[in-house]
């Protein structure tokens, strides 16, 4: 049995899609649907059961899991970089993850954890996923810090020898529609361009970057789940790994690709960055991918323009935009 936490969320539901593509339906989806629209991510998917997060955690605490678990793909977390409730993040992103990791170590199940590129802070220490760099990182927000704390715990307790913790960079693609302000700029741009014919980006607050010239490592969600599938097939590959393309692109590049995919000429305006983001905004991210490549991962990452075009034309513009 495969357990996917956050299985109704963005990357989690994409992982359920990938498992289905590989002929696997013995899947338990763990999530907290509440009043969100996440349930729509599951309509096209095949799985044997859905369990609420709190019920699942009670099962874990009391050793009452009714399944023979092959792997836990742990994508369940609060992923809002603007979340300010530190206690909530500690409980949801740190303690929850540690419990699942210990469960898998005890039972021999594969454990794949979602870390984040937010752990890299302002990027002044670079974006290397080696252990020495990890020990020195200073995240800019509580979300990144909660992810950093799990990686540090796993390192300190010797757990990184038996798990894979993945630092996802800027992920975009289908099934992110429920995320509100945390949706990718591609998703937001498609709606804004369709309604107004223009896309607005934040002005740069960094002297080294022009407006819209701030750079991110944008990775297509289908590539993320290809990496996770490969890790499921290669349980001897363990540690903290970056999951990006290794090639940073500008916000202007990204938005221009959306306009092109919509067969429109780019019209971009720049607005002031909100005060609460200043000093906490990464002007540049680019994954160092040597570690994953050296481990033998064969996944070829989708070029930005190709990924954006597929996302826009095959999903955002479709009657059924879901995987």
Swiss-Prot record:
Membrane-traversing stretches: none
Residues binding NADP(+), per UniProt: 10-11, 31-32, 38, 53, 75-79, 92, 147, 171, 179
A Gene Ontology molecular function term of the record: NADP binding
Note on how the cofactor is bound: Binds 1 NADP(+) per subunit.
InterPro entries recorded: Epimerase_deHydtase (IPR001509), Heptose_epim (IPR011912), NAD(P)-bd_dom_sf (IPR036291)
Enzyme class (EC, first level): isomerase
Disulfide bonds: none
Keywords annotated in UniProt: Carbohydrate metabolism, Isomerase, NADP
Pathway the protein acts in: Nucleotide-sugar biosynthesis; ADP-L-glycero-beta-D-manno-heptose biosynthesis; ADP-L-glycero-beta-D-manno-heptose from D-glycero-beta-D-manno-heptose 7-phosphate: step 4/4
EC number: 5.1.3.20
Role summary: Catalyzes the interconversion between ADP-D-glycero-beta-D-manno-heptose and ADP-L-glycero-beta-D-manno-heptose via an epimerization at carbon 6 of the heptose.
Subunit comment: Homopentamer.
HAMAP family: Heptose_epimerase (MF_01601)
Domain remark from Swiss-Prot or TrEMBL: Contains a large N-terminal NADP-binding domain, and a smaller C-terminal substrate-binding domain.
Name of the featured protein: ADP-L-glycero-D-manno-heptose-6-epimerase
């Amino acid at each position: 049995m495969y357990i996917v936490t956050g299985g109704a969320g963005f990357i989690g539901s994409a992982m359920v899609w990938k498992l289905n593509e590989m002929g696997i339906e013995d899947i338990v989806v763990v999530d907290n649907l509440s009043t969100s629209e996440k349930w729509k991510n599951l309509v096209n998917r095949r799985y044997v059961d859905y369990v609420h997060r709190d019920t699942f955690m009670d099962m874990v605490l009391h050793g009452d899991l009714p399944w023979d678990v092959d792997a836990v793909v742990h994508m369940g977390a609060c992923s809002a970089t603007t979340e300010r409730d530190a206690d909530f993040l500690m409980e949801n992103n740190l303690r929850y993850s540690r419990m699942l990791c210990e469960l898998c170590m005890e039972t021999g199940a594969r454990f794949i954890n979602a870390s984040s590129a937010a752990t890299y802070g302002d990027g002044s220490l670079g974006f290397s996923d080696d252990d020495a760099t990890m020990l020195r990182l200073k995240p800019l927000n509580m979300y990144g810090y909660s992810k950093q704390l799990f990686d540090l715990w796993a390192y300190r307790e010797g757990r990184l020898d038996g798990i894979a913790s993945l630092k996802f960079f800027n992920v975009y693609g289908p099934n992110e529609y429920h995320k509100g302000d945390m949706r990718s700029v591609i998703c937001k741009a498609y709606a804004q361009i369709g309604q107004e014919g223009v896309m607005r980006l934040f002005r740069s607050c960094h002297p080294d970057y022009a407006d819209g010239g701030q750079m991110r490592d944008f990775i297509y969600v289908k590539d993320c789940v290809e990496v996770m599938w490969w890790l499921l097939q290669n349980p001897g590959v363990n540690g903290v790994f970056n999951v990006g393309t290794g090639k940073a692109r500008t916000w202007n590049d990204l938005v221009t690709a959306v306009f092109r995919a919509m067969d429109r000429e780019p019209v971009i305006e720049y607005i002031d960055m909100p005060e609460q983001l200043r000093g906490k905004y990464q002007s540049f991210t680019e994954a160092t991918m040597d570690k994953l490549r050296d481990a033998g991962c064969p996944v070829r990452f989708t070029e930005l323009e190709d990924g954006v075009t597929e996302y826009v034309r095959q999903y955002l513009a479709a009657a059924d935009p879901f995987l």
